[in-house]
Design a protein with these regions (language model features):
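Pan-zinc metallopeptidase signature
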Residues: 24-56, 60, 212-282
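Post-HEXXH active-site segment of zinc metalloproteases
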Residues: 151, 155, 166-204, 243-248
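Active-site alpha-helix of zinc metalloproteases
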Residues: 147-159, 163-164, 220, 224
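Auxiliary, metal-adjacent structural segments of Zn-dependent hydrolase domains
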Residues: 60-150
Length: 282
């Protein structure tokens, strides 16, 4: 059954069409963490990543998982099977091995401190929804899941995967993306997909036109823009998304062009779709 997901970021209604998922609003850009194996103790995600890496349960050759509190067996599909099955093969090929860790709550006790898994829900400023620990060829992705809607979890899962991809994108993908963004900047297109890239774009737009299309500020913006757009793209393949227009949104024709580019670079797996017209008529 296809459910509707309403996203209150900067995109356009009804652009993405896919398979399965709940109804929800996209959460703010801010991480939240999950829980410890032992209620009486706090463990940092770094400590848990070291401890858990040998005891993960395999989903696919590239993906494994572990729950730090009881998860009903009937929930495994929406937390694990469906989102992993929706990933394009070309995306999977670029990723390290990934361990998905479902925690009750994640907390950052101090502004620059380590993220910890805790049993009780932290105060809102300390709550983290997702974080990652990357060592060698294993990335451990931690998520706050207790009391969170599955659609929120999906957003953060795909955002963490997009972040990994943005650190490993091949030259061909990078050049393609840079070309798209330079065209947008030449046309003085305003708006973005999400808050991170929007803020970096504002800084870039304050520079002289000749200085906008290269250099570190441009590359930083391009990486975040790629991450935000890939998050939306992957989420849309997994789930049926209605995107709610916002005042900072990227104009729909430019967003569509980005998604078409990602579709050509990272085609969806069989029986998963990007645009409404991709869905076979019954």
């Amino acid at each position: 059954m296809v459910a509707k997901l309403q996203i209150s970021v900067f995109c356009v209604w009804g652009l993405l069409q896919s398979n399965r998922s709940p109804t929800l609003k996209m959460p703010p850009v801010k991480g939240r963490p999950r829980t410890t194996p032992r209620a009486a103790t706090r463990s940092t995600t770094d400590e848990l990543a070291r401890r858990l890496k040998g005891g993960l349960t395999v989903i696919t050759p590239r993906f494994s998982w572990h729950a730090l509190y009881p998860i009903a067996e009937e929930d495994h599909r929406q937390y694990l099977t469906d989102p992993v099955a929706a990933l394009p093969p070309a995306v999977i090929d670029l990723l390290p091995r990934i361990g998905i860790v479902l925690a009750p709550y994640l907390e950052r006790p101090a502004a620059k401190g380590a993220v910890e898994v805790v049993e009780k829900k932290p105060a809102e400023p300390k709550l983290v929804l997702s974080t990652r620990v990357v060592n060698d060829e294993l990335a451990m992705l931690f998520f706050t899941t207790r009391g969170e809607q599955v659609a929120d979890y999906h957003y953060f899962l795909f955002d963490e995967i997009a972040a990994l991809l943005s650190q490993r994108w091949p030259d061909e993908v990078q050049e393609n993306w840079h070309r798209l963004l330079r065209e947008e900047l030449s046309a003085e297109v305003h708006g973005e997909v999400d808050d991170r890239s929007w803020r970096l774009k504002q800084g870039l737009l304050r520079r002289p036109m000749a200085a906008r299309k290269d250099g570190k500020p441009f590359r930083d913006y391009a990486r975040e823009s790629f991450r935000d757009t890939v998050t939306l793209y992957l989420h849309g393949i997994c789930c049926d998304i209605d995107v709610e227009a916002g005042p900072r949104q990227l104009p729909s024709r430019y967003l569509r062009k980005r998604l078409e580019s990602l579709k050509s670079l990272f085609p969806p797996p069989p029986e998963h779709y990007v645009f409404p017209e991709d869905v076979p008529r019954s």
